[in-house]
Swiss-Prot record:
Residues modified by glycosylation: 78, 101, 114, 143, 167, 191, 215, 242, 263, 311, 332, 381, 477, 541, 544, 569, 593, 608, 618, 712, 796, 812, 836, 844
Keywords assigned by UniProt, alphabetized: Cell membrane, Glycoprotein, Leucine-rich repeat, Membrane, Receptor, Repeat, Signal, Transmembrane, Transmembrane helix
One GO cellular component, as annotated: plasma membrane
LRR repeat intervals: 120-143, 144-167, 168-192, 194-216, 217-240, 241-264, 266-287, 288-312, 313-336, 338-360, 361-384, 386-409, 412-434, 435-459, 460-483, 487-510, 511-534, 535-557, 558-580, 581-605, 606-630, 632-652, 653-675, 677-698, 699-722, 765-789, 790-813, 815-837, 839-862
UniProt main location, coarse: membrane
Extracellular side, ranges: 32-910
This protein's name: Receptor-like protein 34
Protein origin, superkingdom: Eukaryota
N-terminal signal peptide: 1-31
InterPro entries for this protein: Leu-rich_rpt, Leu-rich_rpt_typical-subtyp, LRR_dom_sf, LRR_N_plant-typ, LRR_R13L4/SHOC2-like, RLP23-like
Species per Swiss-Prot/TrEMBL record: Arabidopsis thaliana (Mouse-ear cress)
Compartmental location: Cell membrane
Topological category with respect to the lipid bilayer: Single-pass type I membrane protein
Transmembrane annotation, as ranges: 911-931
Length: 957
């Protein structure tokens, strides 16, 4: 008993002792000040990092992804704990910065090679997405060996990915998408064996994807869209068994779709659109049981509908548009019970309208336009309410009326039935009144009776967009116009090519109208003044009518952004009220009869105006200075402008197109324009430019036309070295395949001498390149560096004084379609290498001093004989072939040109002159003696003193 008491007492004493120590320690903790987590060297690194960039405008991409921009770094200061700063996360125990999230922080700056971010050694997450960072990724990233997530997407980073990226072996997520990276993907990326996410879309990568990418066995997302990858798709990707998303759209892949993709059994999303794939969809796709989205649009795929897809019952989106598929659509496509969107437009599908598609209850979007479907439009028995919201079946071979059963598609929001042969029956617009959700209706180019705009608009109470282009539309103005508020809410109205003669007065009450196209009609008179008072009107296309002027509005609304008035009969000065349209982005008044000078009041537009086209008018005077600083495109060709190019043009940093052709500009070559980093088209044709052009650095230039001026001198040997956009260096710069210069509502155009004739480029492809130096006084040799321009399509050096040989380096111009070196002083042989240019369809070597064998090859056999005339020393079977219809010389005769024929005629003339020379000289001497002896007044007056005066007068001028 006593022992138990001793043990209990000991336990109590020990317990009390521990309790006392705990209380004392806890008191010390309460009494001690709060410990700061942030380590000093970490704070110092972050503050230095903050000073490497500036706070600018929010990135517009943030709204696109639903993230609100916030200036996170404004909370960073010396007097606060860096672990509490916005975007900064620290390790709770060590105080080391482990995460840095600066996405959507409105930041602007460059990535420095000695960036202080390299001192954040324990950083695991770095997110600088959706800002305005630029420059190259530097080696400072290599120090961040603990990184597991790196996101630099949606910036302006450029250059190549360093091979050392493979050293970041802990990375699980790497997103570099939507930047300006270029070059090839380094094979070292295959060392990132823990990657689950790899995003490289929207850059300028080219070449082939390294096979080492097949080592990324944990990868679930691979985004490579919007680059210039080409060649064979690596079969090693077929081993990425965990891949769920594969994005390969907008590249330059060709050949057949690799069957190895069928091995990716976990694939959910597969995007292969906008490439050059051909053949059929592989049967191995039948293994993709998890696939929900498939997009193979804009390729060259063919064959019948791919039945292999019918087993993939999880498919919700299928896009086969813009291919070469044929045959009929199978009725058992209804087995795809989860199908929500089916796009098969612009193929060659045949048969009748596949009304069985309406059986699929989930179907929401259906696009079948641009096929060869025929028969009457029959929608079948639509018994249950349809979920269909989008239906486009235009541009087929359907005949007959629009069926009344369409009114049962009560959820329809967009409907396109253009190019329907209604057999001249009137359209019953009342059937559309049942479609309460209808927002967009396209009924262009119907073979129907006249549509009365005044009668049909009341049927559309909620319609936002209506396209009646290509129909015969009556817009007769009623005697009285109601002043009641409009019941319609149309925002976009397309009436192009409708035969309208008077401006539709009914539009006066359409206060919601924002987009109006009345181009290609016969509207006469003046543009009504009330049009400028519509509060929401931002786009107005008046082009190709017979307007003669503008009624001046009392007070124009400032909303107008696009004003297109080309090809009318406008006269007088450019209206001053246009200067009040301060939101104007595009102004096209080309092909009219405007006169006077360019209004100086246009200075009011300089902050927004991006595209100005005043070509083909009668404008005179000089160029105003400093009024178009934001311009992307300036075209004032075919006017009567004088003086020099304004030097203020060198400050137009956004300028891509400058066209001043056919004016009276007298100036030297504008070398100073080389400071414009975005300049792509330069046209100085048919002016009075003069002097040498020497070395001109235009790395972005795609088209240059300086023809028919007075330029002289020789071109340096290395003249074209820096013209990288026309060389192979510039081949892969753009992320998209086919694009045009211009904006969404306006495309640039120009006239260019191509293949011996003037050709109008209604739209300018961004991949189109041309050099025209013709009609000047250039001399010396053609620079060998011309051979660097491997992307060149048109080369015209004619009508100059070039000497020497045609450089064999022209044989490197594998994209060349047109070559003209005529009317020079070139000698030697035509280079055999030119015969290897498979795309060359036009060439002109005439009127030089060329000799030797004309190269063989199909390109030479398709030329005209006149392309070789004026070169006495040319011979060969190719020449005999192209000139056989002109004459057939004997085998021992030299090739005779029109020039030699003229020389023969001259010889005959001299022989005839010699025959008459003897009697003529005797008669002349006798007649002269009589005149000199008697000096008659009638002879001396007209041929003596007056003649001397005439000579002096002529010399003075």
């Amino acid at each position: 008993m006593k022992g138990s008491w001793v043990v209990s007492t000991s336990i109590i004493r020990i317990t009390l002792s521990f309790t006392f120590l705990f209380i004392c320690h806890f008191s010390d903790v309460l009494a001690a000040p709060t410990r700061h987590l942030c380590r000093p060297e970490q704070k110092d690194a972050l503050l230095k990092f903050k000073n490497e960039f500036e706070i600018g405008k929010p990135s517009p991409t943030c709204k696109m992804v639903g993230i609100e921009s916030h200036r996170k770094t404004e909370s960073w200061g010396n007097n606060s704990d860096c672990c509490n700063w916005e975007g900064v996360t620290c390790n709770a125990k060590s105080g080391e910065v482990i995460e840095l999230n600066l996405s959507c922080s409105s930041l602007h700056g460059r990535f420095h090679s000695n960036s202080s971010i390299r001192n954040l050694h324990f950083l695991t997450t770095l997110d600088r997405s959706h800002n305005d960072f630029e420059g190259q990724i530097t080696s400072s990233i290599e120090n961040l060996s603990h990184l597991t997530s790196l996101d630099l997407s949606y910036n302006r980073f450029s250059g190549q990915i360093l091979n050392s990226i493979g050293n970041l072996s802990r990375l699980t997520s790497l997103d570099l998408s939507f930047n300006q990276f270029s070059g090839q993907i380094p094979s070292s990326i295959g060392n990132l064996s823990h990657l689950t996410f790899l995003g490289l879309s929207g850059n300028r990568f080219f070449g082939q994807i390294p096979s080492s990418i097949g080592n990324l066995s944990h990868l679930t997302f691979l985004g490579l869209s919007g680059n210039r990858f080409f060649g064979q798709f690596p079969s090693s990707i077929g081993g990425l068994s965990n891949l769920t998303n594969l994005h390969l759209s907008y590249n330059k892949y060709s050949g057949q779709i690799p069957s190895s993709i069928g091995n990716l059994s976990q694939l959910i999303v597969l995007y292969l659109s906008v490439n050059n794939f051909y053949g059929e969809i592989p049967s191995s796709f039948g293994n993709l049981n998890q696939l929900t989205r498939l997009d193979v649009s804009f390729n060259k795929l063919g064959g019948n509908f791919p039945n292999v897809l019918l087993n993939l019952t999880g498919l919700s989106v299928v896009s086969l548009s813009n291919n070469k598929f044929t045959g009929t659509l199978p009725p058992n496509i209804t087995s795809l019970s989860n199908l929500m969107a089916f796009y098969a437009s612009d193929n060659a599908f045949t048969g009748t309208f596949p009304s069985f598609l309406f059986i699929i209850p989930s179907l929401t979007y259906l696009g079948l336009s641009g096929n060869q479907l025929k028969g009457t439009l029959e929608f079948g028995n639509i018994s249950s309410p349809s979920n269909l919201q989008y239906l486009n079946i235009g541009s087929n071979n359907f005949i007959g009326p629009i069926p009344s059963s369409i009114s049962k598609l009560i959820n329809l929001q967009e409907l396109g039935i253009s190019h329907l042969n209604t057999q001249c029956r009137p359209v019953d617009f009342s059937i559309f009144s049942h479609l309460k959700s209808l927002d967009d209706l396209r009924l262009s180019y119907l073979t129907t009776t006249t549509i009365d705009l005044n009668d049909i608009l009341p049927y559309f109470k909620t319609l936002r967009s209506l396209d009646l282009s290509g129909n015969l539309v009556s817009a007769t103005n009623k005697s009285s116009v109601s002043s009641d508020p409009p019941s319609q809410s149309i925002q976009s109205l397309y009436l192009s090519g409708c035969g309208i003669t008077d401006f539709p007065e009914i539009l006066r009450t359409q206060h919601e109208l924002g987009f109006l196209d009345v181009s290609n009609n016969k509207i006469k008179g003046q543009v009504p003044g009330w049009l400028w008072t519509l509060p929401n009107l931002f786009y107005l296309n008046l082009s190709n009518n017979t307007f003669i002027g503008f009624q001046r509005p009392t007070k124009p609304e400032p909303s107008m952004a696009y004003l297109l008035g080309s090809n009318n009969n406008f006269t007088g000065k450019i209206p001053s009220f246009i200067c009040e349209l301060r939101s104007l982005y595009t102004l096209d008044l080309s092909d009219n009869n405007f006169s006077g000078s360019i209004p100086r009041c246009m200075e009011n537009l300089k902050s927004n105006l991006s595209e100005l086209n005043l070509r083909q008018n009668n404008l005179s005077g000089g160029f105003p200075e400093h009024i178009f600083e934001s311009l992307r495109s300036l075209d004032v060709g075919h006017n009567q402008l004088v003086g020099k190019l304004p030097r203020s043009l060198r400050f137009f940093s956004n300028l891509e197109v400058l066209n001043v052709e056919s004016n009276r500009i007298n100036d030297m070559f504008p070398f100073w324009l080389s400071s414009l980093q975005k300049l792509q088209v330069l046209v100085l044709r048919s002016n009075a430019f003069h002097g040498p052009i020497n070395q001109a650095l235009f790395p972005k230039l795609r088209i240059i036309d300086i023809s028919h001026n007075h330029f002289n001198g020789s071109l340096p040997t290395e003249y074209f070295v820096e013209w990288s956009r026309m060389s192979s260096l510039g081949t892969y710069e753009d992320g998209s395949n086919v694009n045009y210069l211009g904006s969404g509502y306006y495309q640039d155009s120009m006239v260019l001498m191509n293949k011996g004739v003037e050709s109008e480029l209604v739209r300018i492809l961004t991949i189109y390149t041309a050099v025209d130096f013709s009609g000047n006084k250039f001399e010396g040799e053609i620079p060998k560096s011309i051979g660097l321009l491997k992307e060149l399509h048109v080369l015209n050096l004619s009508n100059n004084a070039f000497t020497g040989h045609i450089p064999s380096s022209i044989g490197n111009l594998t994209a060349l379609e047109s070559l003209d070196v005529s009317q020079n002083k070139l000698y030697g042989e035509i280079p055999q290498e030119i015969g290897n240019l498979s795309l060359l369809s036009y060439m002109n070597f005439s009127h030089n001093q060329l000799t030797g064998l004309v190269p063989g090859g199909q390109q030479f056999l398709t030329q005209r004989c006149s392309s070789f005339e004026g070169n006495l020393g040319l011979f060969g079977s190719s020449l005999e072939e192209v000139c056989r219809d002109i004459h057939t010389p004997a085998s021992h005769q030299q090739f005779e040109t029109p020039q030699t024929e003229e020389e023969d005629e001259d010889l005959i003339s001299w022989i005839a002159a010699a025959i008459g020379f003897g009697p003529g000289i005797a008669f002349g001497l006798m007649f002269g003696y009589i005149l000199v002896s008697y000096k008659p007044e009638w002879f001396m007056n007209p041929f003596g003193r007056n003649n001397r005066r005439r000579k002096r007068h002529t010399t003075t001028h």
